[in-house]
Amino acid sequence: MLNQVRVPAALLAGIAFGAVFGMPLTVGDGFSLGMRKRVYVLMAACSLAAELVAIVSSTVGIMKLSEPREMPTYASPILLLRGELQFEWIATQFNFLFGLLMFAGAIALRAVSVIDCPNLAKSVSLLFVAVALHMYGIVNKFIRTLSGCDNIAGLGWQYFKLVLHQGGFLNYASIACMVAAAYYLGKVSSHTWHVTRAAVHVACS
């Protein structure tokens, strides 16, 4: 089951890598287009990062299953994964699903930014929004059986708690880097807003 996630995660990571740099930022972008581009880059980067973690987590889980050791008998493969490889299984599920949703959202955002025909742009964008919502609905319906969580938000919270429980310098350093990334993201939003306001003020004066 881990390998069934690892393969599509690897394929999606390859696509997301190209998508991250698919909408370069330019100086002449207005506030709306500039913000859409920045959100698109962020969503594509989140998709790539999440799929990379899913690949590593599933690979580690597969390698652990190959270790010669005695294990209790489980009624199903899912119970085996939840019992013996809880961290790897939760990490694989959450990052794969989160990356998939981020990728669908990024495509929807890109459609309204680069397609010149307004009606077609809205049609394509809404198509991918519908796909993202449908995928989220499918996940919420079956995720309790797979992980014991009610929805993907609960799955993410469980994943975060497991990361804290794992401990270790590298895990804490990773969390610190995520906090720093959020800080700089806030600075990007603030800078874009102030620059655009200044440009509008100059144009109107």
Which residues make up each language-model segment?
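Cytosol/matrix-facing amphipathic helices and coiled-coil assembly/linker segments
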Residues: M1-D29, A44, A49-P68
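Alpha-helical transmembrane segments of integral membrane proteins
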Residues: G34-C204
